[in-house]
Amino acid sequence: TTGTSSTDRIEGMIKNAIYGIITAKACGVKEPTVGILNVDGARQTEKELKRLQEGGYDIRFTESSRSDGGCVMRGNGVLRATPDIMVMDSLTGNVMSKMLSSFTTGGSYEASGFGYGPGIGEGYKNLVMIISRASGTPVIANAIRYAAQLVRGKVFDVADAEFKAAKKAGLDKILSELKAAREKS
């Protein structure tokens, strides 16, 4: 997903993890794995997602292929597609999507990929797929197929269940604590 989560990096990354889980499950991945890209806020995001996990939210962290392991991923984890879901902030995700979809064209045309994903959020009932003016025909065709897969996978029902489970595990408390800490600083 891109740009729909939060203007706060850590809050956005936490929400992006949940949105990624929703999307993966709607696409048929029953137990998706989550990795966190090694960007500013990754360790705090990991800590908060593990709090959700300890609260009972079913989140499965992947292990980096690097010798130091852990769920915080480096660039090789991106290229190897180590996790099903690579969590990052929305701006980094946008840059990553553009680079990976247009590297064969020198950046002028997005020739591969599925666009920038669906807009996912709590209470959403309309599916909006995101593409850009540089998205080529293959990307647009893939985005349409992706949208169909999400609809067949009942993305809104999956979202309702995941948000309910995340809230039961303490999502609202975690997000309000993050907000309070931001306001103090």
Q: In which residue ranges do the predicted regions lie?
A:
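Active-site acidic/histidine clusters and adjacent loop/turn architecture
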Residues: 177
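Glycine-rich phosphate/diphosphate-binding loop of Rossmann-like nucleotide-binding domains
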Residues: 6-66
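Long, low-complexity, intrinsically disordered segments
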Residues: 183-185
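A generic structural motif
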Residues: 61-69, 158-163
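Short, glycine-/small-residue-rich phosphate/pyrophosphate-handling segment
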Residues: 1-27, 32, 126-154
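Glycine-rich beta-alpha junction loops
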Residues: 5-6, 38-43, 65-70, 89-93, ...
